[in-house]
Amino acid sequence: KVYSRXELAKVLQDFGREAY
């Protein structure tokens, strides 16, 4: 899948929450 910037920002933010 090709992510838009916005989508990437949200995915990375959610991933960060999971990590911590």
UniProtKB/Swiss-Prot annotation:
On the 2D-gel the determined pI of this protein is: 5.3, its MW is: 16.8 kDa. It comes from the Eukaryota. This is Sperm acrosome membrane-associated protein 3, processed form. It comes from Vulpes vulpes. Belongs to the glycosyl hydrolase 22 family. Sperm surface membrane protein that may be involved in sperm-egg plasma membrane adhesion and fusion during fertilization. It could be a potential receptor for the egg oligosaccharide residue N-acetylglucosamine, which is present in the extracellular matrix over the egg plasma membrane.
